[in-house]
Amino acid sequence: MAPWPELENSQPTSEKYTVKADGEQSAKPEKAKETEKDDTGTPITKIELVPSHSTATLIEEPTEVEDPWDLPELKDTGLKWSERDTKGKILCVFQGIGKFILLLVFLYFFVCSLDVLSSAFQLVGGKVAGKFFNNNSIMSNPLAGMVIGVLVTVLVQSSSTSTSIVVSMVASSLLPVHAAIPIIMGANIGTSITNTIVALMQAGDRKEFRRAFAGATVHDFFNWLSVLVLLPLEAATGYLERLTNLVVESFHFKNGEEAPELLKVITDPFTKLIIQLDKSILNQIAMNDESVQNKSMIKIWCKTFTNVTERNVTVPSPENCTSPSLCWTDGLYTWTIKNVTYKENIAKCQHIFVNFNLSDAIVGTILLITSLLILCTCLILIVKLLGSVLRGQVAAVIKKTINTDFPYPFSWVTGYLAILVGAGMTFIVQSSSVFTSAMTPLIGIGVISIQRAYPLTLGANIGTTTTAILAALASPGSTLKSSLQIALCHFFFNISGIILWYPIPFTRLPIRLAKGLGNISSKYRWFAIVYLIVFFLLIPLAVFGLSLIGWPVLVGVASPIVLVILLVVVLKILQSFCPGSLPQKLRSWDFLPFWMRSLEPWDKLITSLTSCFQMRCCCCCRVCCRLCCGLCGCSKCCRCTKCSEDLEEGKDEPVKSPEAFNNLAMDKEAQDGVTKSEVDASGTKIVSSVTAL
């Protein structure tokens, strides 16, 4: 006897089952239900299993766990090209052209806002950054030099500016090359903050923010890990200084033409109408020139005339005269004739703040707020446009072109080709920050994967050094060697980092670390801001402050912290790969208090502290809020608290049940006491978790 006797003749036939027009199912056999009695006399109802009901019981569908790092499928929700008439096709073409033009316009203003943002940071903190270079005793400490490079680049938002200051100091013999190399390493770290700030603008959607923040911080982790390995190696061996000195001495470089300006030819006409800076003041402050301490960095006169003329001047004694024939005495004064150089102002600059008598800090604050607003607006609009354009076949082609590897056995070549593409694109835009910041929204919406963004970012690091090398070759003969050696140190530092963290897949730690940080930041979005403040401000400032006190104090404070970090890393590795070698208590982090091993208590604390700033709005305000959100297309999570609560109230999770459950036998069974499942308008079964299981 079969374990399921009802299934022996369970083939569906047209004679046994009919479906009426009104959707009810009726069984033709006379005894679909048989009532029996047990020993106690209680009636038992036997229900004959319908085939669709029985298959649901016997077949288990495998559940697939969704990988959050898989690229989303960008489906085309509009009409297909074949379904459009002639008028619709023409409108579609013009609409595509219009979107492409708008995309270029928003991208142009996005790049210009980055340039203005850099100028704003220089006005606000440029003089403070220049003073970091005054203390030569601190600069001799490699660790302090590295954090000075980070702080200066964060404050001026330009690694080119901080590098040019270092080159000027090396050329003036105020700073040796071996002390300048850690500053270059720190500048490489500081320049990666820009695209991390850009990634914060996509915090509205958790999935997009996970990808965007991971794609941005992969640059951070590469630079930090490279410095962690190469800075002690350079301090112990000086290999970068020796290698670059050998290259410079072996090849007889001559002064060349200035580095070509490609993107700046387009952006400078607009940004120079907003603000123009005299960046030579930063170099003079770094060289401890007291005459420019109170001088404004805002350029007032763009056209000047330098004239050399002979004038009668007084000198202390006849020995100071230019020649005996040009020396005479008039009473108590000795006079002579000397060549005097004076500068005559001819034409003022044409920018907004040229006639405003405002301090650098006020102008910098105004530009900082304005440029951040423009940056956020342009980024949001770029993401919306890309989201509407990159759909269907277009998205599939672009994603396949960017993320697909070459066929075996040449698949390994794809990553190195991506490095070359990243270097070439960065050479064109002449800024690694611009290239990586423009790539961040593409990572967020799922066009570029993290695995492909990593080599593109490494190429951007190489591309920005080639621009510096060309700029160094355009230097005058007195500074050619020093500036070229610094630029080559930057180049070989990035090459060494690529050798460490790219060729072998196992060593691509920046990808895994960035994914981990992306998972944490998408769940606790405030942690992204904490990461920026801690790694780019607090840690460098703490190291710099301890360096001011002295090297022994820095070692005494840092050693226990480094030891604890190493113990945590080793314990985490042992827990993951060989937990059997650990005591039972150390196989997990449960022995620690909950607030030390989880961010959930901190999240509750921060949520409670910030709840007073969340907007509570009335019914009328909710209508306005939803109208504004509908116009700008922003995500639901950026709406006010009351609107979000209204949207989440009574929200039932739609679970697509297997087809076997979506049958009329279940409805028949529901009439006998089982809760009937509700079906929404789209045909999706809205069921509870118990019913689905």
Curated annotation (Swiss-Prot):
Residues 111-135, 234-361, 430-485, 547-550 are extracellular. Keywords: Cell membrane, Disulfide bond, Glycoprotein, Ion transport, Membrane, Sodium, Sodium transport, Symport, Transmembrane, Transmembrane helix, Transport. GO terms for molecular function: phosphate ion binding; sodium ion binding; sodium:phosphate symporter activity. Residues 17-40 have a biased composition (Basic and acidic residues). Its main location: membrane. Disulfide bonds join 302-349. The chain crosses the membrane at residues 90-110, 136-156, 213-233, 362-382, 409-429, 486-506, 526-546, 551-571. GO terms for cellular component: apical plasma membrane; brush border; membrane; vesicle. InterPro entries: Na/Pi_transpt. Belongs to the SLC34A transporter family. This is Sodium-dependent phosphate transport protein 2B. It comes from Bos taurus (Bovine). The gene is SLC34A2.
